[in-house]
């Protein structure tokens, strides 16, 4: 491609809307342009990167025995109603009606569609196992789109589904997909780690996320400092601290005027927050749920939702709902006598002695409260783990880092096949539901994550296999006929070799061309300058190193070396 013919628009200034490096650089390098909040148009340069990532995904999925097809993005409501998710998915789903007033949605995910196809096409165990995937545009009406394509309302995703006759088959399919995902992210140049995860709205049992460490990641990821254990904080089990055993004391009501926060309570009672139990009140669809935690702990809404059961939306209760449940102003809720549909008590609170709670009376608290004697509820793990707690596998300390999810694999089991009546005839002639797995990769999010891990102050540094172009050929002075002619000859020879080459034949200063090449992240640069009269050119790698002066034949070999180093063939 010649840059004089290319739709490219690099930007020197950072767009005000961009908060993170990938968003800034995707706009500055001309990979995409914003059309609306969370909606982007991909320019030629960006589309080439996306297609390169797609091709890596295709190769690894095909090598693992999966078959590609393409489902419709427009899905009739009936399929989602069969699975029970039409109402359960919530406000993120884009819903619409056709001219006959029939309900449809723009697919945020495709479990129902794949299940419908397979139940109509596969009748016997002899046709199993089966693994299908597609690379499709998805739509989710995010409450707050941000960070460019990291959280957008329209995005490209690879979603795949396996269908097996038994659990052993699913386990095998799951492991094949796990290995394929490791290969995909390695080839994309991403340092991604599989971590234990919650299944969320997808449902099912076993689940792992592929996480990329990132300071701007939206997830907290728990890592063990000694072993390979890793989990999303939503999934990671907490280790309860056991309070020192004390003699149970009589409950005492204490006036605490305008003392609401844990910090203020600790000062008022001259105690540690560990001696206080806070009561948080949630609205879970039509249920009001109270959760009791130690004062210094954070609630884990995923664990809470899982304990409640089928929950469409979990949010903090309104001030009115709190007053109705407690009979008091906000800040004085407690588990004794509270009027809620469900009372969840973190396991740590059940092991505390003589602690302080809200009295369900404005400006009043109770002290010397003990679980079991004074109140009871459903005991479980309802909080986030914290740095320094014990690893559930080896007992050593854990640490917590921010991360971005780029892939997710699930063992769905029969969740969708049973609800949608998707069955096959087994060896004994009996109808059985398909055992399913689900495997997703965010293609556009992967592109952004690559940029997050591969950039410097000058721009993007693409790994060779995903780069839009492998080599940028730059005549230092296009007005110099010899430089322009030789640059085009080198460009044409590289293309014959199978190299994706970009010839910057624009009538711009060499410095401008160098800056654009670095901003766009082209892995190799060949500069045809004054030394061309001696048969020499300059070669430079984008990811560092000195400028090398080489003959034209040597520069071709140098390009080949970089392909070999990246395990790529020409």
Curated annotation (Swiss-Prot):
This is Proline--tRNA ligase. Its main location: cytoplasm. GO terms for biological process: prolyl-tRNA aminoacylation. Catalyzes the attachment of proline to tRNA(Pro) in a two-step reaction: proline is first activated by ATP to form Pro-AMP and then transferred to the acceptor end of tRNA(Pro). As ProRS can inadvertently accommodate and process non-cognate amino acids such as alanine and cysteine, to avoid such errors it has two additional distinct editing activities against alanine. One activity is designated as 'pretransfer' editing and involves the tRNA(Pro)-independent hydrolysis of activated Ala-AMP. The lineage of its organism: Bacteria, Bacillati, Bacillota, Clostridia, Eubacteriales. GO terms for molecular function: aminoacyl-tRNA deacylase activity; ATP binding; catalytic activity, acting on a protein; proline-tRNA ligase activity; transferase activity. Consists of three domains: the N-terminal catalytic domain, the editing domain and the C-terminal anticodon-binding domain. It catalyses: tRNA(Pro) + L-proline + ATP = L-prolyl-tRNA(Pro) + AMP + diphosphate. Belongs to the class-II aminoacyl-tRNA synthetase family. ProS type 1 subfamily. PROSITE patterns: AA_TRNA_LIGASE_II. Its EC number is 6.1.1.15. Homodimer. NCBIfam families: PRK09194.1, proS_fam_II. Keywords: Aminoacyl-tRNA synthetase, ATP-binding, Cytoplasm, Ligase, Nucleotide-binding, Protein biosynthesis. It is found in: Cytoplasm. InterPro entries: aa-tRNA-synt_IIb, aa-tRNA-synth_II, aa-tRNA-synth_II/BPL/LPL, Anticodon-bd, Anticodon-bd_dom_sf, Pro-tRNA-ligase_IIa, Pro-tRNA-synth_IIa_bac-type, Pro-tRNA-Synthase_IIa_type1. One of its GO terms (cellular component) is cytosol. Gene3D superfamilies: Anticodon-binding domain, Bira Bifunctional Protein, Domain 2. It comes from the Bacteria.
């Amino acid at each position: 491609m010649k840059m004089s013919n290319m739709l490219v628009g690099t930007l020197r200034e950072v767009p005000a809307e961009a908060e993170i490096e990938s968003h800034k650089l995707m706009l500055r390098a001309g990979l995409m342009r914003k059309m609306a909040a969370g909606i982007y148009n991909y320019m030629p340069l960006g589309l080439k990167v996306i297609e390169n990532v797609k091709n890596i995904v295709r190769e690894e999925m095909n090598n693992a025995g999966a078959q590609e097809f393409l489902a419709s993005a427009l899905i009739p409501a009936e399929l989602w109603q069969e699975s029970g998710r039409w109402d359960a998915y919530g406000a993120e789903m884009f819903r619409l009606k056709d001219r006959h007033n029939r309900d449809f949605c723009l697919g945020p995910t495709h479990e129902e569609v794949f299940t419908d196809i397979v139940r109509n096409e596969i009748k016997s165990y002899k046709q199993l196992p089966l693994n299908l995937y597609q690379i499709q545009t998805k739509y989710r009406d995010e409450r707050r789109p941000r960070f460019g394509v990291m959280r957008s309302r329209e995005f490209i995703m690879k979603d795949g589904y396996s269908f097996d006759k038994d659990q052993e088959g699913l386990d095998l399919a799951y492991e094949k997909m796990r290995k394929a995902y490791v290969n995909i992210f390695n080839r994309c140049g991403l340092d991604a780690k599989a971590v234990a995860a919650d299944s969320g709205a997808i449902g099912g049992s076993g689940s792992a996320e592929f996480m990329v460490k990132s300071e701007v990641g939206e997830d907290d990821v728990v890592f063990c400092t000694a072993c390979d254990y890793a989990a999303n904080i939503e999934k990671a089990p907490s280790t309860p601290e056991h309070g020192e055993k004390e003699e149970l004391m009589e409950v005492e009501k204490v006036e605490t005027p305008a003392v609401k926060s844990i910090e203020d309570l600790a000062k008022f009672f001259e105690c540690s927050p560990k001696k206080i139990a806070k009561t948080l009140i949630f609205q879970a669809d039509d249920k009001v749920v109270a959760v009791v935690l130690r004062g210094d702990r954070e609630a884990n809404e995923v664990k809470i939702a899982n304990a409640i059961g089928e929950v469409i939306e979990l949010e903090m209760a309104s001030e009115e709902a709190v007053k109705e449940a407690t009979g008091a102003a906000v800040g004085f809720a407690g588990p004794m006598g509270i009027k809620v549909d469900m009372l969840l008590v973190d396991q740590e609170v059940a092991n505390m002695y003589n602690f302080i709670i809200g009295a369900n009376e404005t400006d009043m608290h109770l002290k010397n409260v003990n679980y079991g004697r004074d109140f009871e509820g459903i005991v479980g793990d309802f909080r986030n783990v914290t740095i320094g707690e014990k690893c559930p596998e080896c007992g050593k300390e854990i640490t917590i880092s921010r991360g971005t999810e780029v892939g997710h694999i699930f063992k769905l089991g029969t969740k969708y096949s049973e609800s949608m009546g998707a069955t096959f005839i087994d060896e004994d002639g009996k109808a059985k539901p398909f055992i399913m797995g689900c495997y997703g990769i965010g293609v556009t999010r992967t592109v952004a994550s690559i940029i997050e891990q591969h950039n410097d102050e000058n721009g993007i540094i693409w790994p060779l296999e995903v780069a839009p172009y492998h080599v940028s050929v730059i005549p230092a002075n296009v007005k110099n006929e010899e430089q322009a002619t030789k640059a085009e000859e080198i460009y044409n020879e590289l293309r014959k070799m199978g190299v994706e080459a970009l010839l910057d034949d624009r009538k711009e200063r060499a410095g401008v061309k160098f800056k654009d090449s670095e901003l766009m992240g082209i892995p190799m640069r060949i500069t045809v300058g004054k030394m061309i009269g001696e048969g020499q050119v300059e070669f430079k790698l984008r990811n560092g190193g000195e400028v090398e002066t080489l003959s034209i034949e040597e520069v071709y070999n140098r390009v080949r070396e970089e392909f070999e180093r990246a395990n790529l063939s020409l």
